[in-house]
Amino acid sequence: MITLNIYICLFYVMVIVLQAQLKQSKGYVRFVTQVIQARRGLKEVKLIYEEEIKPEDKCMFGFFPHGVLAATVLVFMNFNNGPMKNMIGLGSRFLLTLPFVGLFGRLWGLQAVNAHSIKTLLGKGTNVGLLPGGFEEATLTVTDEIRVFIKERKGFIKYALEYNYGIYPVLAVNEHKYFSTFRYF
């Protein structure tokens, strides 16, 4: 029994190491986009801008609320026009390290949200999208109201100011309705 556990551990370590080397796959993105749009809540994707964003503007998009899947970030990461075109989505290191889940995130084009990757991307002038509420906000998701968790989340604002980026909040309407949820155990 112990040897079986060692093989399983080695397998998962190998998966984690291999998936860390993956880059975005456009074919995978097209396929999953079609699947996501077939689900309820994301059949129509529309952007409504409260103010003009010029193509040369450096943008940091903060998406909220973080639903169960955070599908809105995934859809807009590969939007084919506007300021979100070529936006890099940032996800937690934990998500990107999980076996198989991290594989799908990396194929989609997600990168780790840590100081090094943010400084590198912002230093290049790349538009980025992130979910300031993170896992905590995802656990608050219910289908009948929008809930946001932003307490003590100010590091991204520091980087935006340091690299002269505009911060644009993005309300993902119906993100919380994408999956059925329940309020309490």
Predicted regions mapped to residue ranges:
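Short aromatic/hydrophobic-glycine micro-motifs
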Residues: 45, 109-110, 165
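Short secondary-structure junctions
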Residues: 41-43
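Membrane-lumen (extracellular) interface motif
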Residues: 1-9
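Catalytic core of membrane glycerolipid acyltransferases/transacylases, capturing the structured
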Residues: 11-33, 39, 53-124, 134-151
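Phosphate-binding P-loop/Walker A region and its immediate neighborhood
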Residues: 131
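A cross-family acyltransferase "interaction/gating" segment
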Residues: 95, 134, 140-185
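Cytochrome P450 catalytic-domain "roof"
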Residues: 45-52
